């Protein structure tokens, strides 16, 4: 069977599934199965594939039809300017989370020397993206999941940043190491009752630990803010990602913990997404 025939077949199969982009998904999965890029598929559409490649593709296709996210199938996800290793133990990076990277780079110039803490680091993509852009920055990432920390360490190795970053398997409550110029965090902030309303791909496959914000969505956020107030240097900056409907309550929590609010950022969908504040 040739490449084009396989893609046509896959497009029909995924078209009847939860996939929102069956054609693109089919191309990505076939590229993965034969270890070629998508351009190769277009230029060699009549190429006959060997049985091993077809079998590998069919296996990936079945998993995608069941709703498993593309990032978990191909073990990678592009974030900021790099590809990061991703598996089922970490949340798949979202484009809106790039706001944390973008704002950090705006706040601190190339020559700044900075010590950064990333609370709930997951794959490490936020912290490592920042370090990749700034040679004088050093980072520490913590996560309650040991498996997530292993992913973050692997990504640091891939991007040759292991000499400028340390990762610790620790709950935010128990972490007491260091003082920081900047704290960044994308903590779990979804209410428990809303987890069942998430898209199928997210609900069934992404780690609940990285999504569940407790009964009211604030249990993890409150802990992160409290710990940040202890670990952040005076006049240090804090960049926090949040749910679209959480701004008012978080602003109050920040003020009670002696933070000055610099600004609230909206995501690409025009929803409130990040708060930048300063420890006073």
Model-assigned labels for residue ranges:
Residues 189-220:
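Mobile active-site "lid"/loop adjacent to the S-adenosyl-L-methionine
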Residues 1-34, 41-42, 46:
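Non-catalytic accessory regions of SAM-dependent methyltransferases
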Residues 98-197, 223:
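Conserved SAM/SAH cofactor-binding pocket of Class I
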Residues 32-107:
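Conserved AdoMet
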Residues 215-278:
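Conserved Class I SAM-dependent methyltransferase catalytic core
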Residues 14, 108, 156, 228, ...:
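Conserved hydrophobic residues forming the short capping helix/wall of the S-adenosyl-L-methionine
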């Amino acid at each position: 069977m040739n490449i084009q025939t396989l893609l046509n077949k896959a497009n029909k199969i995924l078209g009847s599934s939860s996939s929102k982009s069956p054609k693109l998904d089919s191309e990505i999965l076939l590229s993965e199965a034969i270890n070629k890029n998508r351009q190769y598929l277009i230029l060699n559409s009549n190429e006959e594939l060997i049985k091993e490649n077809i079998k590998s593709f069919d296996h990936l296709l079945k998993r995608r039809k069941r709703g498993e996210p593309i990032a978990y199938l191909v073990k990678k996800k592009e974030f900021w300017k790099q590809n990061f290793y991703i598996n089922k133990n970490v949340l798949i990076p979202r484009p809106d989370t790039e706001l944390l990277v973008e704002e950090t780079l705006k706040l601190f110039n190339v020559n700044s020397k900075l010590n950064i803490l990333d609370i709930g680091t997951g794959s490490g993509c936020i912290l490592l993206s920042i370090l990749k852009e700034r040679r004088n920055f050093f980072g520490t990432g913590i996560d309650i999941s040991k498996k997530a920390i292993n992913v973050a360490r692997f990504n640091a190795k891939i991007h040759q940043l292991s000499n400028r970053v340390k990762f610790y398997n620790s709950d935010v409550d128990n972490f007491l190491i260091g003082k920081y110029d900047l704290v960044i965090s994308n903590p779990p902030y979804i209410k428990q009752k809303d987890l069942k309303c998430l898209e199928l791909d997210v609900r069934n496959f992404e780690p609940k630990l990285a999504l569940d914000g407790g009964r009211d969505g604030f249990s993890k956020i409150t802990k992160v803010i409290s710990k940040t107030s202890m670990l952040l240097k005076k006049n240090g900056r804090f960049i926090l990602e949040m749910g679209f409907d959480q701004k008012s309550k978080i602003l109050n929590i920040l003020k009670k913990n002696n933070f000055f609010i610099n600004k609230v950022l909206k995501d690409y969908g025009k929803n409130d997404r990040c708060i930048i504040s300063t420890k006073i």
